[in-house]
Amino acid sequence: MLLRKVPGFVPASPWGLRLPQKFLFLLFLSGLVTLCFGALFLLPHSSRLKRLFLAPRTQQPGLEMVEEIAGLPRAREQEPPPNPAPAAPAPGKHDPSSRGRRKEWLRRTRPTGHREEEIVPFSFDFNAFRSRLRHPVLGTRAGESEEPQSRVRAQREKIKEMMQFAWQSYKRYAMGKNELRPLTKDGYEGNMFGGLSGATVIDSLDTLYLMELKEEFQEAKAWVEESFHLNVSGEASLFEVNIRYIGGLLSAFYLTGEEVFRIKAIKLGEKLLPAFNTPTGIPKGVVSFKRSWGWATAGSSSILAEFGSLHLEFLHLTELSGNQVFAEKVRNIRKVLRKIDKPFGLYPNFLSPVSGNWVQHHVSVGGLGDSFYEYLIKSWLMSAKTDMEAKNMYYEALEAIETYLLNVSPEGLTYIAEWRGGILDHKMGHLACFSGGMIALGAEDAKEEKRAHYRELAAQITKTCHESYARSDTKLGPEAFWFNSGKEAVATHLSESYYILRPEVVESYMYLWRQTHDPIYREWGWEVVMALEKHCRTEAGFSGIQDVYNSTPNHDNKQQSFFLAETLKALIGCVLLPRPARGTGISIFCSLKTTCSPWKTGCSTPRPTRSQ
């Protein structure tokens, strides 16, 4: 009888269906059965593999996790308070020092989510920070040549001119928009910033400053002061807003001490906090600024590279604001990742923020996974080498990557493959090419017997990525390149042949140059400059290209903000600074985050432990 109430549905009899209707119903049913049966082939073939990927259900993080983060004693373990309050003074006696110590202990042990107003207003002493810098932000170091050789000086000025041209084109045609479209000479907002504007402005701040483009920097600063508003109501990518906006603002503050950058960064960081309102504390990838929640219309999984690339920014937000909630959020992410089972020590790319279990069996050092590993080693360096947890996680992950993903092609090219449930895809993405620089960056702090090995490995991976550029007609690298069917370091599909002004390869050149002083990396960087000038420069800015194997490629009509923030900064990193004394080659760049922005090291944010 129910079927008779469906509009437009009239069965042949009160109790039956017409033959065509029966056929459609059976067709639907058979398709459903086929789909369910086919899904069985995607499941692990053994219970052992299932145990590797599907962690047993554990109690959802709640008060117990908050207590541990805040440094409170856990009741079930009956541990004494780390700093017990002093005994109460005898009646009638007044002990101001004891009362002061007790208040201090209460402040340390009270959960930060319910803290009362601080008695003393928080302030960050920028002048004290600046006085502790080991090297000047601009200019040369003591004992270094004021002027490099003429060829290097000309290269430096050329890259600065490229930055000026990219900025002036953006300012003329798209000022205030997120990115420039150079072919149509207009701006592009996109839908991943939740209504925020000016991504190129904020992403470019530190590059303009470091290149000593003073007029352009003042233009960017004025726009931030007057036009960068946070009263937006869209849905934004947590990852993109963090690395482009918050990262750019933090870098600008550390370089200049201008309060506008600090204040904007903190306020924007507060707007991202609802993304962490999940059962595990693993944030959703999309946050709704309108509803102040993290359950926007995105899918059910969180991506490793996204929730794993928040640590640096959020620790600095805590340091600059005095609000411990930022640090607590990212330390909770670390806690979840420490506890969960990892297949062969590898970190899959997708994690459920609800259950805390891995969702898929895909492991990649390229897209979806890349910056997680980068943030581990940089967290170690930025903590003035005190964050032992980050150090251990990084070297353990690197060992697993080398054991299960690293390959050498028949031509002798070293590459990092992708892993899908035990089966390797013999390809390497452009995003994975940052790993050469990352491994070089971490080689110094590896075990003594591994240091030379890691330096050689970094050089070999960087050479492979250079080959992906050298084997194209434009001398620019594809989005992904393969090692099969007799072809090596080339894209095999047109859909992977594009180049969107990405920085990862030149970042590795920069790190290897600063560490080894081998001029080959400077030469490779200059090859990229020439290729960008020939194939990506247009009348009104720089544009990505659709096919690197076409000597006259079509443009994609987009000047990415990271081209100014990362690619050009990494290129000038090879030639702008005078050649440093051997042994200090990468010190000035060791704190570059994923968007290649310089930050302070030795973050003084207190790190709560079980003993506090």
Locate each region found by the language model.
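Glycan-recognition and catalytic cores of secretory/periplasmic carbohydrate-active enzymes
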Residues: L2-A12, G16-R18, L24-F25, G31-R48, ...
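Cytosolic juxtamembrane regulatory segments of membrane proteins
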Residues: R51-L63
